[in-house]
Design a protein with these regions (language model features):
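Active-site-adjacent alpha-helix of alpha/beta-hydrolase-fold enzymes
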Residues: 93-105
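Secondary-structure transition/hinge residues
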Residues: 28-29, 60, 64, 133, ...
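Non-transmembrane alpha-helical segments in soluble domains
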Residues: 17-22, 53, 99, 126, ...
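Alpha-helix C-cap/termination motif
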Residues: 3-5, 73, 100-101, 135
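Conserved serine/cysteine hydrolase catalytic core
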Residues: 32, 40-96
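Catalytic active-site module of serine/aspartate enzymes centered on a nucleophile-bearing elbow/loop
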Residues: 102-139
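Helix-rich cap/lid subdomain of alpha/beta-hydrolase
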Residues: 1-39, 54-60
């Protein structure tokens, strides 16, 4: 509603923002300077908070609508990298079903990694990009 975002913004603290970002990175540490670099405090401005809440609230219905088409419509090379300790989007919620729906998909489960594999395992992410490029004939 119209009242909740300003209230949340008024009572949000730097500590709450830091805790939220830490939760996204867990179990890896947040890189030095990351919170300032991405402008994390901007997320609690009422207009931004409201927009994000709307997007999150509408995400699941869109995924439910799209998921049955994954196997037929994903004809491009598909690499999925997912941390086994991702508490934001657990492995069995999206990546395993996506891999199962798309016969040519490759799922790499990163042990001990949370929601930010591109920070935790950048070399493996680059390797996946290189595999996709090679499969697509771009290398």
């Amino acid at each position: 509603g119209a009242i909740l975002p300003p209230l949340i913004a008024a009572f949000a603290s730097d500590t709450r923002i830091e805790d939220a970002v830490k939760g996204i990175f867990t179990p890896q540490p947040v890189p030095d300077g990351y919170i300032d670099h991405i402008g994390a405090p901007l997320t609690i401005r009422p207009v931004n908070f409201r927009a994000n809440a709307r997007q999150v609230a509408s995400l699941r219905p869109h995924i439910v609508d799209m998921a049955p088409r994954y196997g037929a419509e994903f004809t491009m090379p598909l690499e999925i990298l997912h941390g086994d300790l991702d508490a934001t989007v657990p492995l069995d919620i999206h990546s395993i079903p996506l891999r199962d729906a798309v016969p040519h998909a490759r799922l790499t489960v990163l042990e001990g990694v949370g929601h930010m594999p591109h920070h935790a395992s950048p070399t493996l992410v680059i390797d996946a990009i290189d595999r996709i490029a090679a499969t697509a004939g771009l290398r």
